[in-house]
Regions:
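Alpha/propeptide regions of enzymes that mature by internal proteolysis
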Residues: 1-340
Length: 340
């Protein structure tokens, strides 16, 4: 979905985007939501499947980068050490990480009877942001059934905005949530895709920049001052054959896209980035000690850096533009950008 120039009057960057302009333009990547929207309860779960197969036995190469570590995402230590992702990536609110992780472990155990029997454990990845402003987060309303529903909902054409884990999130003082975009890159005469998905819950209204324009200069009186705290989770996906080292380099460039929208990465804001490639797989079992692997030459990586910057910038703005105004906990209301 991303940003439609005909609808919003501007476009981000100049690289072409994929058919949907979402992370799901990377073949095999799907996203699903379970949204809880009932009075004081404004929260949910979002799930991302790296590919339609068995991710535990057919792992994807992955990397992560912590820009500012005010966050509780699980699974990063092992990704940083081994360079692989072996479960779906789940997103939820901060206090529901435990419940969601338990549900994800059960999901993996049901599909992989060898885990902790004839092989080792599993590394569940659960990302979070704090939605306590709009959501009764202390009520712990997310259940394992909601996780199962989000996983079952995974598809290529998914919703953005105030849905799933993004239901109660606030971005730049406005209604944020889930945003996504993609870019196409040509290498050796073949087209490849880089996609981004964000869970936006960070930054201040005074810092918001849209298409190079500081928005507070136009609408300053409409949003009360607030601290730069919250978090933003960014996931990058690609079908380009990259090494774990190169994926980490892509993670580092996410900050370029965040800064273009005005993010200053405040003390209380957790900026976490994960990246994976569907091109290079790591089998859980192998009868060979040496595995063949294709890899991009570093001299050809600059277009990928630009693609990441454009995808992340557009994903943040897409999370704002596709959100709706939400009233939640204690009657608090957070306006969406399109209502201003």
């Amino acid at each position: 979905m991303g940003i439609d120039k005909n609808e919003w009057g501007f476009r981000v960057g100049h690289l072409p985007h994929g058919e949907r302009n979402k992370i799901s333009d990377v073949p095999g990547v799907t996203v699903g939501h379970c949204t809880l929207a009932d009075g004081d309860i404004q929260t949910g779960v979002t799930a991302l499947l790296p590919h339609p197969g068995d991710v535990f036995h057919d792992k994807v190469l992955a990397a992560c980068h912590v820009i500012n570590g005010f966050g509780k995402t699980t699974g990063l230590v092992q990704i940083d050490e081994l360079g692989t992702l072996e479960t779906p990536i789940l997103f939820t609110n901060t206090l529901s990480v435990g419940t969601v992780e338990t549900a994800l472990v059960k999901y993996m155990l049901e599909r992989n009877p060898d885990i902790c029997e004839t092989t080792g454990s599993v590394n569940p990845v659960v990302c979070e942001c704090n939605d306590c402003g709009l959501n009764d987060i202390r009520g712990l309303h997310v259940t394992e059934a909601h996780v199962a529903a989000a996983l079952a909902d995974c598809k290529a054409d998914f919703a953005e905005g105030a849905v799933g884990a993004g239901r109660g999130m606030r971005c730049h003082g406005l209604k944020g949530g889930i945003g996504s975009a993609s870019r196409l890159v040509e290498l050796d005469g073949k087209s490849y895709t880089i996609g981004a998905l964000v869970l936006s819950n960070h930054a201040t209204f005074d810092d918001l920049i849209v298409a190079g324009t500081p928005i507070h200069e136009l609408l300053e009186a409409r949003i009360p001052p607030h601290e730069d705290k919250g978090s933003i989770i960014t996931v990058l996906a690609t079908d380009i054959p990259l090494s774990e080292r190169q994926l980490r380099r892509l993670c580092h460039r996410a900050l370029v896209g965040l800064s273009r929208t005005g993010s200053a990465c405040g003390n209380g804001s957790g900026e976490i980035v994960l990246a994976f490639t569907t091109a290079n797989r790591m089998p859980h079992y192998s009868d060979k000690a040496l595995l063949p692997m294709e890899m991009l030459h570093d001299d050809a990586i600059n277009p990928l850096f630009r693609a990441v910057a454009e995808c992340v910038e557009e994903s943040v703005l897409s999370s704002l533009l596709h959100a709706e105004t939400v009233t939640g906990y204690h009657g608090r209301t957070v306006q969406c950008l399109s209502d201003l």
